[in-house]
């Protein structure tokens, strides 16, 4: 094979008319491609060429059955052929499911436009996956699948659901993400056994009072819609564990949210929230609270009652202070983000407020100093982001931050890094770009774990020789 390919290359580089028939025969024998029959075919081909007045390009290289130009191309399928083929495959899957009495049917990503009405025969189904198709509607016959527990319909073009779905009394999970719903289909409010409901990425503008019927819900995701308010009846979802209403247009939360005392995750980021109800303090099991990118100017004191909270994100609001002692009360808090607000100083509450914090982000505020001793109890603080503030110096106990792994001090007004930076022996990332530094302390050579050091946009004239000790430092 390799010999034949080599000859093909030769044929392209050299005019085949130059080579004699004898030479070509010799080459063909060397490649094992010629016998008497091949020679006869060559003679016939030459005769045909002479008759036609042109040379067949495929005969320029004996031993090669087809040239690239002569490859047979399949015609494009007639319009509708693919759709018919898809429908045939779907019917085949339905028949197979019925014959095998399967309880799970996966028809995802089959380019299905219309589900066959014969789906009604599969009454044994408990799981039906139809995501990633081109469905604009469902046949009423789906309502015959009375044992169905899981119905996955995401990534279609559904604008409504048939009322017959109300017959599905066993439904536990419905996934309607990425469709074209302008409202929560009325039949959904009748699916009282639902525990999980996904409605993300639709065009829904409101949640009706009938949401109270879904009292078994533990997970409700209605993020990335156009919802402007939640009804008071949301408070009747007493089993709710996760509520995701992010990326909507909410300005207020109903005070009844405080009745959802089982919630552990509440995501309200990217709304237009102006305030929070005091009843949020009733969410005693809350662990994660997302409030970034809203218009909050204050946080209620009652949040201190959410003692199990381990993640609090308040990025990009207009908050200038927190209630005194709030952070000290949140004894399980490990991640705190206060970036892009209006803080001019650290929250009031003393060192105890950071004793459990693992990651603190204060980026893009107006803070001009880090108080001495503020991290004296922060034994697990390993990530501190103070980028884009107004720091002119670092505290005298800077060298005691021995657990620090990532430290971002970029875009401040620092003109000096203390010599006791040598105490930050766990440091792996140090960002000092966009400051006023003219030199670095010799103690930086003690940061043997340092792998990233950003010094861009400073006034450095030289670097200490001790930089050479940083064996793990990665230079871009």
Predicted regions: what they are:
Residues 459:
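Short, glycine/acidic-rich beta->alpha junctions
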Residues 1-431, 436-442, 449-452, 462-465, ...:
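The feature captures the LRR N-terminal capping module
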């Amino acid at each position: 094979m390799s010999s034949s390919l080599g000859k093909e290359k030769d044929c392209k580089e050299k005019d085949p008319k130059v080579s004699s028939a004898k030479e070509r025969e010799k080459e063909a024998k060397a490649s094992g491609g010629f016998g008497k029959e091949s020679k006869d075919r060559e003679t016939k081909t030459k005769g045909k060429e002479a008759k036609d007045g042109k040379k067949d390009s495929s005969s320029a290289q004996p031993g090669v059955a087809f040239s690239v130009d002569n490859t047979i191309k399949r015609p494009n399928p007639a319009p509708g052929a693919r759709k018919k083929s898809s429908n045939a495959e779907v019917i085949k899957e339905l028949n197979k499911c019925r014959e095998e009495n399967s309880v799970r049917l996966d028809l995802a990503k089959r380019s299905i436009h219309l589900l066959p009405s014969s789906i009604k025969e599969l009454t044994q189904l408990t799981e039906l996956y139809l995501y990633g198709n081109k469905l604009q509607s469902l046949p009423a016959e789906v309502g015959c699948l009375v044992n169905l527990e899981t119905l996955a319909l995401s990534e279609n073009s559904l604008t409504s659901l048939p009322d017959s779905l109300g017959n599905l009394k066993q439904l536990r999970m419905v996934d309607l993400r990425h469709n074209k719903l302008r409202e929560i289909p009325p039949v959904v409010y009748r699916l009282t056994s639902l525990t999980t409901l996904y409605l993300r990425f639709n065009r829904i503008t409101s949640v009706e009072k009938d949401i109270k019927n879904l009292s078994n819900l533990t997970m409700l995701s209605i993020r990335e819609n156009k919802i402007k308010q939640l009804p008071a009846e949301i408070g009747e979802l007493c089993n709710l564990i996760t509520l995701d209403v992010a990326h909507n247009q909410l300005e207020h939360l109903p005070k009844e949210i405080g009745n959802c005392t089982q919630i552990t995750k509440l995501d309200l980021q990217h709304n237009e929230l102006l305030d929070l109800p005091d009843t949020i303090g009733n969410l005693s099991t809350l662990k994660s609270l997302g409030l970034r990118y809203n218009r909050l100017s204050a946080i209620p004191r009652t949040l201190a009652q959410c003692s199990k909270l381990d993640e609090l994100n308040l990025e990009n609001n207009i908050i200038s202070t927190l209630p005194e002692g709030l952070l000290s009360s949140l004894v399980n808090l490990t991640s705190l983000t206060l970036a892009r607000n209006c803080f001019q100083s650290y929250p009031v509450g003393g060192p105890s407020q950071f004793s459990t914090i693992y990651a603190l982000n204060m980026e893009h505020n107006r803070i001009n100093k880090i108080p001495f001793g503020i991290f004296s109890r922060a034994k697990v603080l390993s990530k501190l982001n103070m980028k884009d503030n107004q720091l002119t110096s670092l505290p005298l106990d800077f060298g005691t931050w021995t657990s620090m792994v990532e430290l971002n001090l970029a875009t401040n007004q620092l003109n000096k890094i203390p010599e006791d930076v040598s105490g930050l022996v766990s440091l792996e990332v140090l960002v000092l770009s966009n400051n006023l530094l003219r030199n670095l302390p010799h103690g930086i050579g003690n940061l043997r774990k340092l792998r990233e050091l950003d010094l861009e946009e400073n006034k450095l004239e030289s670097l200490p020789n001790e930089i050479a000790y940083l064996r793990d430092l990665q230079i871009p």
